[in-house]
Amino acid sequence: MIKPRTPPGIMELLPREQIAFQRMLDVIRRNYERFGFLPIETPVFELSDVLLTKSGGETERQVYFVQSTGALANAAAAADEGAENGGLPELALRFDLTVPLARYVAEHEHDLSFPFRRYQMQRVYRGERAQRGRFREFYQCDIDVIGKDALSIRYDAEVLAVIHAVFAELGIGDFKVQLNNRKLLRGFFESLGVAEGELQLAVLREVDKIDKRGADYVRDTLVGEGFGIAAEQVARILAFVAVRSEGHADALAQLQALEASVGASATLGEGIAELREVLELVKALGVPERAYCLNFSIARGLDYYTGTVYETTLTDHPQIGSICSGGRYESLASHYTKSRLPGVGISIGLTRLFWQLREAGLIQGIAESSVQAMVALMDETRLDDVLDIARRLRIAGINTEVQMEPKKVGKQFQYAARAGIRFVVLAGDDELARGVVAVKDLVREQQFDVARDELASTLLVELEQAKAMP
């Protein structure tokens, strides 16, 4: 007999936890739609040459490739399949939703209205090293705005407002959206003589590791043999990326001070102007000052980000790390089309976020079941009555389960309690003869009679009151 088990790096939930997870998905979806984003889905696997066009960083080394059983069984066929794509299998599982989005927009460009506002909530796959809190299969919940030829920086501010709306409704504690612009980093590097190209991108990736690995690690890496940057330059880089702001006025003051201290640089000036406009619009969008700040160390590891970048953290739980991140990209879709399709977006890694919140004891106030009432069957002869009662409750919008086999009342109460069902409806001979049913509230341990015709309205009131209970 084979032992039942899941592969490492998978989060599989019991129904009560799945309900909590699903409700978080619902909150995210609801807020995405409130801001006018439209849903799409893309295939779980893409053509390898399309998917790996410009991922960069660690991600490309974590891709799962897909081969047919026929290709695996026939070595020659497998070799032929791989030879068409530089030795790689033809298909690969998506590692994020941004690259498939770029392919989607380029492929359907003539059928879409621009700016195209999309949300997408699907699983993605990465070959992470199996360890606690790291997942190989996980949900990402993304929004992106794609423009045609150009995309106003104003959308960067709106995306931040969406982040705020989502996490404010999720109610998981105070949070802060940390803002930066990669043009600031690039312009500053240019002033130090760190040239454009691969070196600059590599330095950006290392800077992005400061919060996880620490400044000493980044310093040692940048002065080491792989980079060979002078210690004095590295010290200036670390001082630059240590800049933080508190409050709206301080953020603007930090940008003004940077502009005065570094001097003329087209790239740096562009980044400062973009960040300044984002900050002003975020204020106009009603995002409270406590919810955002500048953090010049935020770079984002993926190479396709070119301007604004975001990372969101929980104020009281910094150990959880980033709970939402993203940024602007100018040229990702240019690998699939001659049209210029710039975009800006963010992603919530919901699987890891849920796991971290559960570990921290922050998943609270969630009903244990999506079933709101159960109608007990105590006598086979009353099945038609029980089914009619359940039908009426469902018409009223109450999620209702029916016990299809007669059992002792005590056993049905035990079942409902274990399943997390709060209200049990009893329709025995005595109750039905009086034109009533009995309702057992398993949380308050109270039982009351209600007229059969008034059951649905009474339960709706009880359910509304139950929502308000701590």
Swiss-Prot record:
Coiled coil stretches, renumbered: none
Reaction(s) catalysed (UniProt annotation): tRNA(His) + L-histidine + ATP = L-histidyl-tRNA(His) + AMP + diphosphate + H(+)
EC number: 6.1.1.21
Listed GO MF terms: ATP binding; histidine-tRNA ligase activity
Principal EC category: ligase
GO cellular component: cytoplasm
SUPFAM superfamilies: Class II aaRS ABD-related, Class II aaRS and biotin synthetases
InterPro entries, sorted: aa-tRNA-synth_II, aa-tRNA-synth_II/BPL/LPL, Anticodon-bd, Anticodon-bd_dom_sf, His-tRNA-ligase, HisRS-like_core, HisRS/HisZ, HisRS_anticodon
Entry keywords, A to Z: Aminoacyl-tRNA synthetase, ATP-binding, Cytoplasm, Ligase, Nucleotide-binding, Protein biosynthesis
GO biological process: histidyl-tRNA aminoacylation
Major localization listed first in the record, in broad terms: cytoplasm
UniProt xrefs under PANTHER family: HISTIDINE--TRNA LIGASE (PTHR11476:SF7), HISTIDYL-TRNA SYNTHETASE (PTHR11476)
Subunit structure: Homodimer.
NCBIfam families associated with the record: hisS (TIGR00442)
Family: Belongs to the class-II aminoacyl-tRNA synthetase family.
Protein name listed in UniProt: Histidine--tRNA ligase
Organism placement in taxonomy: Bacteria, Pseudomonadati, Pseudomonadota, Gammaproteobacteria, Lysobacterales
Name of the coding gene: hisS
